Amino acid sequence: MLRTILIIVPLVIMLSSCSYVYDLHAVAMNGQLMFIVSPASSQQPECLRDIEVVEESGGRETLWSESVSYDDDSANEFPVVYGVALKGQHLTDRKEVSGKPFQRGVIYNVSATTGAMGYGGGRFLIDADGR
């Protein structure tokens, strides 16, 4: 019993320390909405394998959702252009949604997964001027 505990406890500690988080920012560049990793984030991933944009309130409609195989995550580097299909083998275990138009004055949440255990997120708003 003691031997099992001595093996399990370090394993749990090691596995729990493998994940990380980072902040995403929505920015307008060249007439497109792009998602970048915040320069202030302690983690600076270069690529991703999963992204989702949803309304923060109301019907919580999903505006864009895509996920590719873990093996293909390095094919999709930041910055990520809103609505542009991710490269690689798309996963079939969840519904994908192509990029839908935004509404002004609505707050949106963006979330992304990098590798197996990197998680990014952020919020953004399209203002009355469309910015």
Residue ranges and their predicted role:
Residues M1-C18:
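Sec-dependent bacterial lipoprotein signal peptides
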Residues T114-G121:
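Short acidic/polar inter-strand loop motif in beta-rich domains
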Residues R60-V97:
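Extended, solvent-exposed segments with strong compositional bias
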Residues E55, A112-T114:
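Short acidic, glycine-rich loop/turn motifs
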Residues C18-R60, G122-R131:
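N-terminal non-catalytic regions of secreted/periplasmic and cell-surface proteins
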Residues I107-V110:
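A short tyrosine-centered beta-strand micro-motif
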Residues G99-G105:
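Surface-exposed, short loops/turns at beta-strand junctions within beta-sandwich domains
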Residues L24, V97-G99:
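Beta-strand-rich interaction surfaces with strong enrichment in secreted/lumenal proteins
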